[in-house]
Structures are given as C-alpha cells and as structure tokens.
UniProtKB/Swiss-Prot annotation:
Listed Polar residues bias regions: 257-273, 387-396
Protein name (database record): Protein ALEX
Region (Disordered): 1-105, 155-188, 237-350, 387-516, 528-578, 611-689
Coiled coil: none
Composition skew (Basic and acidic residues), residue ranges: 279-301
Membrane topology, as annotated: Peripheral membrane protein
SUBUNIT field: Interacts with the N-terminal region of the XLas isoforms of guanine nucleotide-binding protein G(s) subunit alpha.
Membrane is among the record's keywords: yes
Amino acid sequence: MSPSPTRLTVRSVDPLKTPNLTSRAPVRPSRKSKWAETTAHLQRKPCHSRSNSPAWEISGPPWSSLDHLDPIRHQSLQPSDFGARTPTGAHPGLGAYSPPPEEAMPFEFNEPAQEDRCQPPLQVPDLAPGGPEAWVSRALPAEPGNLGFENTGFREDYSPPPEESVPFQLDGEEFGGDSPPPDSASHATNRHWRFEFPTVAVPSTLCLRPARTRLPSGSRAPLADHARLSDLLTSHTTFPQWRSPDPCLRLAEPPLGSTTTPLSIWTAPQSQVMARPSKSREPQLRASTQRDPHLSDKQPRQETALSAAPLQRRQKSPPSSEEKDPPPNLKQCISSQLLLRSPERTLPKPIRTQLHTQFFRSVLRKSEESQPCPPIFRLLLKMRAQMSGQNQTEGQPQPPLPSPKTTENQPPPPPPSQPPSQPLSQPPSQPPSQPPSQLPRQSLTPKPSLPPGQSPTPKRSPQPRQPLPRRRSLPPGQPPSPLRSPLPGLSLLPEPIQPPGLSLEPQRCQPLLGQPPLEQPMQVLWSGEPGHSRLLQPLGHPSLPAQQLPPEQPLLPAQSLPAGQPLPPQAGPILDPPARRSRLLTRLLRGLLRGRVPGLTNTNVAEAAAGMRLRPASARSSPPAMSRKKGPLAASSGFCGETAALASPGATQSGATRSATSSPEPSEAASVYLSVPDHDPSAPGRPRILWKRGANRCAKKPWRCESRSAQIRNAASSSTSNWRRRRWTTCVHTACCF
C-alpha cells in the first residue's frame, strides 16, 4: 500500500537504479549515494475505499499519476527535453534501458554534471486535476553559474504564488518568501551542502502542492479547510442522533458528548408538544400531562369545572316528554297552596297531614277533569294517603311536608318538572357529595327551604317497619353470630365451622345476638356427660332468666345454656381460649404419622368429634416428660388423652374436671395424664437420642440412631401396639373436623 499524500518522505535514491514507483526496498545493494534526493511515491491508482470518506471530500480528490494528465501536458514532458542522450536514446548512466514516456521524467534532484551542461529543472506546481498547469521549462541558461532564483524553473509569463513555489522542507530549512538572506549562516550551509552549484540554493526540481490539510510554510494558523476537517471529525453534531429506548435513561442525563444542554435543562419537565415522539414500545414518561407544570396547575381548575358542569346541566336541562308543564288548574292550585302555609305552623301535625291529603286530592280531581294527571302526582297521592291512614291507625304523629320559606322577594317554587334522576325532596343545603343511597326517595314533591332558625324534620318511610338492631362490629377474624331464635337465651342452630384462620373450638366469650356481653366465661355441658340436662347460669349475671331443657333432648356441641339456678360443683368444664386451627391440624397430622393416637373402643363418631373440639390447657402445656419438638414419650397426645377420658366410663368426674381446668393441685388422674396406654406404663420408653461414646462424650451432642420411618415401622410391627386401629381413629377424627 502506497503512503498517503500527507506522508511524503525524504530519502536518498540510487541514480543507477531504475525508478520504480511502487517498490520500497532496493533490488540489489547499492553504493552509498553522494546526493540526498527527494522522492515522492505517488499512487498508481486511486483508492476507491478512501474516495467516500469525509477526509477526501474536504482535502480534494485523490492524487493521480502522470498518466492522468492532459495530452497537452504530455507534450511538454517528452524524453527529448531532459538533457543529453546517448546514441541509443537512453539517459547516460541508465545503461541500455530506455524508459517509456510516462516514466521518463527523472525524479532525482539533479543528474551528475555532464561537461558544462546541467539538467534543466522540472516544475510541476500541482498534479491534481483542476489545479495549476503542470509544465517543464525548455529554456536553458548559458552558464550554470548564472542560475538565478528568479529564472530557475519558471516560465517568463508565469509567476507562481509563494505557497506553491517551495512547499517542501529540506534538512530543516524552508525555501520561499521566508527564506533567510543570502549572507546568513544558513545560506552558507546550503551552499556547502549544494556543492554542485557555487551560486545560490536552487529549489526542488519537483514542486508539488501539499494536501489541503497540511499547514502552510511558516504559518501557525490552520487553514480553513483544516479547521473544517477537524470540525467534521470532532463535532458532536455529525454523530447520529441515537436515542435510548428506555425513557428513564433519556430523562436521567443528556446524550454522550453533548455540551450544549446542561443537566438541569435536560431533566426539566417538557411539554407534550415539544417532546419528540418515540418509537419504543415502553411507556413514555414525557407523554403524561403530569410532567408539564402548566398542565398540572390547570388540573384542579378543570376538576372544579367538571364537578360544577353536571349541576348546571341539571338546572338548564329541558323537561322531558312525560314532565310537561302542569295544567293551568294545577298552577292555580299550587298558587293557592301558599295560603295554607301560615296556618300550617300553628296547626297540629295530624290536621296538617289531612289538609295536605285533601289538597292533593282536589288538585288531582281538577286536573283529571281538564287534562289527565301526570303519573307523578298519582304516585304522590297514593303515598300521602297511605301515610295518613297509617298514622291514624297507629296513633303516631305524622311529620308534615316542610313548607318553603315565605319571603317578599322570593318567587314561587318551581313546578315539579325536574328530571327524575334527581330527587326533588333533596334539601338545597345538602352537599352534592352525599351518595344517592342515603338520599330520601319517599316523596317527590318539591321540598321548600326552611326558615333560618328551624331544623328540618326527618321524613318517615311510607310503610312502618320494626326497627332492626344495629349490627355489632366484630373483630377482623371473628365470624358473625348465628341468627337469633324466638327464645331469648337459646340458639337453635349449632355453631358454624369457622374459617381456617380460627380454631375449631367454640369461642369462650362470644354471646349470642341480643344478649349482653359476658364479663366472665360461660360454663358449658357436653352431651354424654352426667348432668347435661341441668341448668347452667352465666357467671356474673344471676338476673338472667332460666330455661329448662328436657332430659331426653340432646345438647348440641358449642351450645350454651343460661340458667337461673346455681351450678353444682361437679358441673362441666370451663372453656379455654381457642387455639389456632393450623397448630391443631399440624398436631393431628403429626400424631397420624407417628402412630401415637390411641384408639377409642366404646365411642362413636359424634363423641369423638366432640372430644376433638375440646382441648384444655393441660393438653397444650407440656408435661415434664415431653420433648419440645417431638411430643410426650408416652404413646398419646394431649387432645386424645382427653377424648379417652371423656369416653371411658371409669374415669372419675373430679379427675376429669381438674385435668380439663388445668388445676394446679396434684391428682392421680392428672398424674397419669388421663390416657389409657396400650403398653405397660411402668416400662421405660425407648430413648430416641443416643449420646455419642468415646472422645466426644463430653460434648453432649445428640446423635440419632435411626430415622423416623424406621421407628414407625418398628412400632407397627410390635405385638403390643395397635397402631393400625389408632391410625384409623385418627382419620375419623380428622374427617369429623372438616
């Protein structure tokens, strides 16, 4: 690859070697040359890959070789013009080689002196197409000593500009207008270097105009082309306007290399009109109107205007086809109604109600005679008649229709021609934000305004209803209570199954609907226990009425019996606070997997379910021989022990009461944990954890000898265990719970 035009080098050239424009290294080792020559390695063919680059557009077209010149310029470069020739027509010193016309131009600085003649200089100011004319002078001076700077290599009618005459630098010296005077030391140095010419220094034989990106000789300011090229390569405006698809990145900082827009202006909210639409699929943050400060200021005004617009539409809306103007007789009756306003305030309410009813009936008759009455007045008349008849039968005072405020400047009330969507009985002072479900819709008569000192009278419903008791606010996880029964203290429905967030046990202090809340827990008796037909009295409420149940009527689980008689000491247990259902279910499954649920021999499914729902505090509290994670060492769990105690007829009532009520007093029944073990209770249980023996004995680290599945398999294969029966019982308990 040939060097670019801007990388012209100065090196010595062997005069005996054939000039090759493309070779860099010599073919054979040449002798050391006496002359330092300048050689410009020109391009044979232009590089097409560089012709499209912006650098070539600024600096001009690529340099061309001599074969690109015009025919007129070729005529001035004939071989006969370059000094003496040998008889064969070749240059002296080139041997028998005769170069072609395009290579006949010598690129050496000058040839060796032949007799008294010298090689005429060759001047090519610019080889680029469209540049100054390239020519070779044919005039030879008479003597070599008379060579002058003014006539060397120049035509008589042409004077090149100073920047085109001597563009190159040889040995650090510059030729041209800024060259030193002939008497200076540098000029003497050049004279010694140019020992061939005892006269002045001659400029280069081949003068080429440099590239436009090269700085001129002796000038420190860059050319306009050079500045334009540097701007083209370094300016951020030529970069493609890349935009990140992420709107967060576009709002975070300006583009890379941007120096025009500061960060504060870039991150400022821009209006939707000024923002450039993006083609990305992600939501655009600039498209929202909330980022525009001008639009955000106008938003509350728009909201108020929108809220006020429906009211204006309702006031300005024309009447519908059904709600035409009332007949003239009706207008007269309405105007005559104003006469009844003054005595209304002095008359009692029943009389006022009768007057209103008679008035509307008369209006209806007169309007039917002249014109059919609108359906709104018929409905109004029926409602008023029902209200007046009910008030007379019940003897309750009926509130009158509020009369409008009578003032001198106030016009008569408008006729009932408003849209049916807006209730006419709505007072003007009522805020429009009140939900429509709370608006009274009983009467459709125009409700006039009240005087300043009078409070509005609440209207009653058309049909009297019994007042329903207000619902009590229950805690977040508590289900609603069952429906109230006709009997004041008895609930006919069993307690519903509670959601998974709660326990399966009955609530301790959950009174029925309509009963006062109990300060203390209520005592409950379960079916199957002695004394279940006795009366129970809630503690702290001796004044509640007693209700006797027949002995043959079974008592459902979780059913309370308030009673008026004192309770004997051997009554049923007191319920404890409920446990979480998740914990109870976990223990059920754990006992099912371990096979430690004892079977029930003489119990049915209902009693088993009743026993499952009871879980005293003694069952939740771990006995001394119970592991924290793996339950008691005996083959029973707490809730199953209580089930066995309730099912076995031999268990003492006092022991069951004490164990169920978590009595701190020691008892024999509590010490044996109220369970019927299948194996010998005196036999020590097999330890589950064996201590390591050896050097690590002092560390007291537990080491399990076998897995849990092996223990279950061994327990099932033992002769003294009823593991399958206990597992079936546990499945029955679990099914009853759900």
